[in-house]
Amino acid sequence: MSRRHAAEKREVLPDAKYGDRVLTKFMNNLMIDGKKSVAERIVYNALDRVQGKLKREPIEVFHEALDNVKPSVEVRSRRVGGATYQVPVEVRPSRREALAIRWLIDASKKRNEHTMEERLAGELADAVNGRGTAVKKREDTHKMADANKAFSHYRW
């Protein structure tokens, strides 16, 4: 553990089309091998597909989907006297957002539509409607935390 102060967070620039910082973070997470233009094209085309599907403003749909995937509690392992307990802890806002983004992208990659645009559009639409793999991941995380509520006094 470093004794120096924590590294300061760098602020990402808002994206070109919607002027949204969270969308830029999403694109950066989706990006492979530094190919940002490819990631941008995938995200923008997916948002256009979602707009056609749901007849709503794409950036609103994106944020609603993200909110439906954000976990409020998670479990962290804690060793106490030779036993390891799964202790439920509240998730801080920055991690909440990061987890939601990661889960949406992972769930999209595992879908079986033909292109990544279709997969991402499908996962976003499902997340808005409260179903889909990413939402299930959040529900499972909450269930784990609820099941281990008895160990919440081991919080640190």
UniProtKB/Swiss-Prot annotation:
Organism encoding this protein: Paracoccus denitrificans (strain Pd 1222)
Assembly and binders: Part of the 30S ribosomal subunit. Contacts proteins S9 and S11.
Keywords per UniProt: Ribonucleoprotein, Ribosomal protein, RNA-binding, rRNA-binding, tRNA-binding
Protein role: One of the primary rRNA binding proteins, it binds directly to 16S rRNA where it nucleates assembly of the head domain of the 30S subunit. Is located at the subunit interface close to the decoding center, probably blocks exit of the E-site tRNA.
InterPro entries linked: Ribosomal_uS7 (IPR000235), Ribosomal_uS7_bac/org-type (IPR005717), Ribosomal_uS7_CS (IPR020606), Ribosomal_uS7_dom (IPR023798), Ribosomal_uS7_dom_sf (IPR036823)
Gene Ontology, cellular component aspect: small ribosomal subunit
UniProt record, GO biological process: translation
Tree of life domain: Bacteria
A molecular-function term among this protein's GO annotations: structural constituent of ribosome
S-S bonds: none
Name of the protein in question: Small ribosomal subunit protein uS7
CDD domains tied to this protein: uS7_Bacteria
Pfam family, one: Ribosomal_S7
Family: Belongs to the universal ribosomal protein uS7 family.
